[in-house]
Amino acid sequence: MQFSALLRQSVRQDDVVLRLGGEEFLIVLKNTDPAYLTLLAAKILDRVRSFDFDLGEGFTLRKTCSIGLVPFPLFPDKPDLLSFEQGIQVADLALYHAKHHGRDQAVALFAGPNGPAQDEDVQRLVTDLGAALDQGFLRMG
């Protein structure tokens, strides 16, 4: 409850914080400039690092978190290319990249110079981060 409250206090009133399960949360930011994503991620990372989570009986704990973020639509010139669920899959790829490359960081993924042209390209985009980066479908930002 403390972590979700910290997230809700970090976002704007119209934004939505959802628990996906376990320790994963989804924040939906409405009408947001992609540059704001990285600012918000930095703010959340700082707040989590400095927050004393109350364990009861006088004990506290400091935590860190990892963040994966993407704008939606991911491809502004092709807003229907990915479904909302596929956008979440791409954000999940970013999250796992952050977790597997040091934790306590945010990884942002943006549209790359080569938008996917075929359905199998879209499938690769949402399941294989390395291939999506190599083929220019995505870029880290």
Regions found by a protein language model. Give the residues of each.
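Catalytic-core segments of nucleotide cyclases and related cyclic-nucleotide turnover enzymes
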Residues: 38, 72-103, 107, 117-137
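A short pre-motif secondary-structure segment
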Residues: 16-19
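A short glycine-centered flexible hinge/capping loop motif at secondary-structure junctions
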Residues: 21-22, 58, 102-103
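Catalytic strand-loop-helix junctions within cyclic-nucleotide turnover domains
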Residues: 28-37, 56-60, 66-87, 113-115
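A structural micro-motif at secondary-structure boundaries
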Residues: 62-64, 140-141
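Alpha-helical scaffold within the catalytic cores of cyclic-nucleotide enzymes
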Residues: 3-8, 36-54, 88-92
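Bacterial c-di-GMP phosphodiesterase EAL domain
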Residues: 30, 138-141
